[in-house]
């Protein structure tokens, strides 16, 4: 789970047709400083459904995000730019990680908003699919967690992602009720472990 929300900071802006696909997508990322949305996701392996979940997310670039899964199991992931907390409610356990190590590789760069990430780590192409625009990112490294990422836009709004990992699993994410650049309270990206839970530092 904590590999997925990393990619959900990829958002929208206006298109400049003289730009390359990577530059167009990067401009979309740079246009978003804050974002909120509800999500639903399905993970498939060998054409079979492995898991299904839903919840809400928020991000503030650079480096802050909140990813809350509500169904089927409640989990909260909060990052403040330096540390990341993963709170598994049913286990009554909080795992604390260095944020960069917890995110890893390309995802951390996406979150931090480094402009060179797309062209450095991915080959990017785009195509029209009816009224939708699909950006297809193929990893240049076999070591990346996600070997392929598809970002699906309806006009200027990101409405879905497809993530292909090293194990052959496909994660299909749909976003709804998206708000771009809302004012977000700082406490949204702060976390204090509830009393009585186990805290594990990694």
UniProtKB/Swiss-Prot annotation:
InterPro entries: LolA/LolB/LppX, OM_lipoprot_carrier_LolA-like, OM_lipoprot_carrier_LolA_Pbac. GO terms for biological process: lipoprotein localization to outer membrane; lipoprotein transport. NCBIfam families: lolA (TIGR00547). This is Outer-membrane lipoprotein carrier protein. Monomer. Participates in the translocation of lipoproteins from the inner membrane to the outer membrane. Only forms a complex with a lipoprotein if the residue after the N-terminal Cys is not an aspartate (The Asp acts as a targeting signal to indicate that the lipoprotein should stay in the inner membrane). The gene is lolA. Residues 1-18 form the signal peptide. One of its GO terms (cellular component) is outer membrane-bounded periplasmic space. It comes from Legionella pneumophila (strain Lens). It comes from the Bacteria.
């Amino acid at each position: 789970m904590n590999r997925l929300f990393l990619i959900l900071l990829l958002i929208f802006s206006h298109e400049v047709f003289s730009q390359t696909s990577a530059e167009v997508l990067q401009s979309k990322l740079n246009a978003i400083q804050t974002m909120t949305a509800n999500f639903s996701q399905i993970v498939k392996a060998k054409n079979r459904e492995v898991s299904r979940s839903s919840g809400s997310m928020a991000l503030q670039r650079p480096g802050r995000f909140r990813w809350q899964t509500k169904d089927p199991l409640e989990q909260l992931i909060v990052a403040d730019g330096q540390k990341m907390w993963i709170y598994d409610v049913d286990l009554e356990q909080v795992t604390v990680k260095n944020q960069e190590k917890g995110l890893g590789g390309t995802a951390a760069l996406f979150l931090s908003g480094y402009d060179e990430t797309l062209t450095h780590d991915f080959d990017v192409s785009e195509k029209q699919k009816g009224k939708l625009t699909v950006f297809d990112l193929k990893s240049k490294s076999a070591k990346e967690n996600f070997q392929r990422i598809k970002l699906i836009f309806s006009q200027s709004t990101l409405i879905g992602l497809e993530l292909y990992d090293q194990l052959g699993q496909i994660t299909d994410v749909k976003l709804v009720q998206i708000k771009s650049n809302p004012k977000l309270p700082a406490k949204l990206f702060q976390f204090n472990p509830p009393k009585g839970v186990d805290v594990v530092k990694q």
